[in-house]
Amino acid sequence: MKETITTPQMELLIYKYFEKSSLVIVPKFSRLNAVRYDDNTKRLGYRSENIVTHECDILSVTKNNFLREVEIKVSVSDFKADFKKKHNHEGNIKQFYYAVPYYILDKIKDLVPEQAGILVAEYNAELLSEHWQLKRYKKAIDNKSATPIDEEKLNKIFRIGYLKYWFYRKREK
């Protein structure tokens, strides 16, 4: 029997994989999370700047303040549907990865854009505690035009991560 993995399981694997190399890791980060900067040249006295241009399944900030995005795909149809969306995975994202289970890798690996990396969830029944492990199959090519985020954006990402944590904890009751 083939073991399958869920999106929440993938989220935890990604968290564990990038935990030591990240300042913060936030699931389901929306493009609506903008930062306001004081700007007296604007009519309202501020300007608003989006952190990302689309929703990210996982957004992490590296220890050098660069953004890293991971798109989770647990089926081939889910993977192919991503290419029908109107957005791309560029902007100020330094590294972009697809995270997929081992059982769809052969069907999608040739469809992955050149700059995107691939993380693969592998199942090993012989492991005592965690049967699923995430391994890097292909390294992401760094986006050379990406710049480190500033303190305001980093604080906003921390805040969104904090709010999401408590939102989900309250729902567990």
Question: Where do the protein language model's features map onto the residues?
Answer:
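Short, flexible, glycine/charge-rich loop motifs used to bind or transfer phosphoryl groups or to couple energy/partner
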Residues: 14, 48-49, 59-60, 84-89, ...
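Catalytic cores of nucleic-acid endonucleases
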Residues: 67, 73-122
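Non-catalytic C-terminal interaction segments of nucleic acid-processing enzymes
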Residues: 1-27, 34, 109-173
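Acidic/glycine-enriched edge-of-secondary-structure segments
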Residues: 40-44, 66-73
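Intrinsically disordered, low-complexity Ser/Thr- and acidic-rich flexible linkers and loops
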Residues: 35-49
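Anionic group-transfer/hydrolysis microenvironments
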Residues: 30, 59, 73
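Short loop/edge segments at beta-strand edges and connector loops
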Residues: 27-29, 100
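Active-site beta-strand-loop-beta-strand hairpin of nuclease catalytic cores
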Residues: 50-69
